[in-house]
Amino acid sequence: MSHPIIVIGSGFAAYQWVKSFRKLDQDTEITIITADNGDDYSKPDLSHVFSRQQCATDLVKQSATEFAQANSVKLITNTYVTAIDAQAKTVSIDDQVLTYSNLILATGSRAFVPPFAGNATDEIITLNSLQEFEQAQERLITAKRITVLGAGLIGTEIAMDLASSHKQVTLCDKASSILPAMLPPFLGSEVQHTMALNGVDFKLNRGISAINRHHQEMLVELDNGEVISSDVVIAAMGLRSNTQLAQQAGLMVNHGIVVNQYMQTSDANIYALGDCAELYGRVRAFIQPTMLAAMALAKTLAGTATPVRLPASLVKAKTPWIPLNLAGKTVGSELTWEIQRNSDGYVAKAFHVETSELSGFIVSHDQAKAAFPLLRLLPGEGA
């Protein structure tokens, strides 16, 4: 008797792999185990639910039952895997032990919230899943004043979307400029200026000392003594890969679950996919690399070993006040910039100061068409 391929997780990576695999193999049994309800949705859509006046159910593309039927999989929902026995090739759930032929870890990531002082830290909202949004949506709808902690991509997108839906928004970060991992300060300041003109308040270069509740208000105390009064506090301070199961199973783990070019972990029959996986030395949190990895792994498990090749990928920021597309390396002291501006926006090219080679680029507004010729000039990764 052959055992099924078991997938742990039901996010984009897991479902993309299932759909890709089913195009190649309609017969191998697949069992998916997920801690949530298994509904198929697009996580990036969480960044603009407020301006679109959407609730959680609006984001569901396909129910868990519909997905399972369409792709001929067994779907076990609202269930946690408690242990993996790599030697026996089993996973434990509740009072059952299931045997796999191959195992795919698509356990995703969790929102990082530092251990702040104060009595209201358990009231901080994160929006890293449909389930989290569903739990918080009533508070978010009724809130008028919202403080967003973290001015990276997700925090900036959420702050802009909240302000677009007429909320009073304060965006906080210990960095001195917004989008510090994506934009050089002189371009980050342009996004900040536009957001400020649209009503967003900024508290940059400031840490958080405490978060407390006082009657109906949440009070965010900054390290300079300033206090921000809010109805709701959202943390968008980065993600951490869910690697606990992999660690318990004895797999090699760094920032994510370490995989080779075939998405194979340190165990020959266990693979990892999505933003729990560390491929070519990095955790990949964006859609395109996850999609390419899922397609390659589908071919590998269907019988044709296929290494993952990652061409340079375009990141499209959901910042409608200043639409941005970027790729490659766009921050660092080793970069020098060449910028062309016109009424359509700007094209900013980053060159390595020593080699003069193109390292990355950022295009704004209607200059998006300039991105694709530049994208072809950037190196990819993998075979």
Where are these regions (language model features)?
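A conserved short coil-to-beta-strand element within the FAD-binding core of flavoproteins
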Residues: 77-88, 204-216
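FAD-binding core/adjacent interface of flavoenzyme oxidoreductases
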Residues: 1-6, 62-145, 221-223, 227, ...
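Glycine-rich Rossmann-fold phosphate-binding loop(s) that bind the pyrophosphate
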Residues: 9-12, 128, 150-152
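Mid-to-C-terminal Rossmann-like scaffold of FAD/NAD(P)H-dependent oxidoreductases
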Residues: 2-4, 276-370
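Rossmann-like dinucleotide-binding cores of NAD(P)H-dependent redox enzymes
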Residues: 60, 154-210, 290, 308-316, ...
